[in-house]
Amino acid sequence: MSVEIKTNTVDPIRQTYGNLQRRFGDKPASRYQEASYDIEAVTNFHYRPLWDPQHELHDPTRTAIRMTDWHKVTDPRQFYYGAYVQTRARMQEATEHAYGFCEKRELLSRLPAELQAKLLRCLVPLRHAELGANMNNSSIAGDSIAATVTQMHIYQAMDRLGMGQYLSRIGLLLDGGTGEALDQAKAYWLDDPIWQGLRRYVEDSFVIRDWFELGLAQNLVLDGLLQPLMYQRFDQWLTENGGSDVAMLTEFMRDWYGESTRWVDAMFKTVLAENDANREQVQAWLEVWEPRAYEALLPLAEEATGIAALDEVRSAFATRLQKIGLKSREE
């Protein structure tokens, strides 16, 4: 007895969804494309939001920036929800190992008292700035249009929440888990002169109505100066002064910043290339917020690293802006 097995090849009738076929042609789409393009409704809205009746739910006039299609702004990381979660899970696994190692061996509590005090005063209060960044990016995700734009900002918001929690854990490692360090860090944020400039900048950013201007003030300008200052220059100072163990607790922030700048720079390059009006508007916003961010960070830099470190960071930031197509006031 013999058994004959035949195989047939089934060719798909359609390679992809209709909206992606119209955008990219009749070919298989990537997971990122399937999860990111033409997601939100653009017609037949049921009602205008009661909290802002001047705008539709997905309204392009919430910003002064004009794009023929906001889907031109894409994520060079190709992050949709699945890819984002998998990437962060790998990063978090390494970070949790570092925190566990530090906690088990009580590395922070063994640091000299003056170094612990400096960590508590100059680093842990940043948890409040991270919450501000979380709120700002959540706001942008709510007001912006095109999922290629909104998803980048909501992922950014979740990252900032996580980074704030890591800073809180550094405080708990300093005080043995009592929470006293977090209370002290809050007092620094509210009352210490070195934090009041940054606090005012963060709180003023909460009332920026144009979501793209808010993205510039938070993700381009403030992060472009604050992140290198505290997680590169201050980390270097700690290493040179006996606090090298802290570096393993802030490695997530350094890796995250290097990744984050990719999509931020790509977004601004795309928007600036769209038309001259966009370029002029973004440059005008930059001339307002960059000097403010620099002035806000001066007292913190003077206490944490020295003002020269902030000036070096600003010079590097000016080079970054030039590559994007903008001009720093520092030049």
From Swiss-Prot:
- What molecular function does GO assign, one term? phenol 2-monooxygenase activity
How is this protein's activity controlled?
Requires DmpM for efficient turnover. The activity of DmpLNO oxygenase is inhibited by dithiothreitol (DTT) by a mechanism apparently involving H(2)O(2) generation.
- What does the record say about the knockout? Cells lacking this gene cannot grow on phenol.
Task: Give the reaction(s) catalysed.
Answer: phenol + NADH + O2 + H(+) = catechol + NAD(+) + H2O
SUPFAM superfamilies, per database record:
Ferritin-like
Protein role: Part of a multicomponent enzyme which catalyzes the degradation of phenol and some of its methylated derivatives. DmpL, DmpN and DmpO form the oxygenase component of the complex. Required for growth on phenol and for in vitro phenol hydroxylase activity.
Could you say which protein family the record assigns here? Answer: Belongs to the TmoE/XamoE family.
What is said about its interaction partners and assembly?
The multicomponent enzyme phenol hydroxylase is formed by DmpL (P1 component), DmpM (P2 component), DmpN (P3 component), DmpO (P4 component) and DmpP (P5 component). The oxygenase component is a dimer composed of three subunits, DmpL, DmpN and DmpO (DmpLNO). DmpL interacts with the auxiliary protein DmpK (P0 component).
Instruction: Identify this protein by name.
Output: Phenol 2-monooxygenase, oxygenase component DmpL
Native source organism of the sequence:
Pseudomonas sp. (strain CF600)
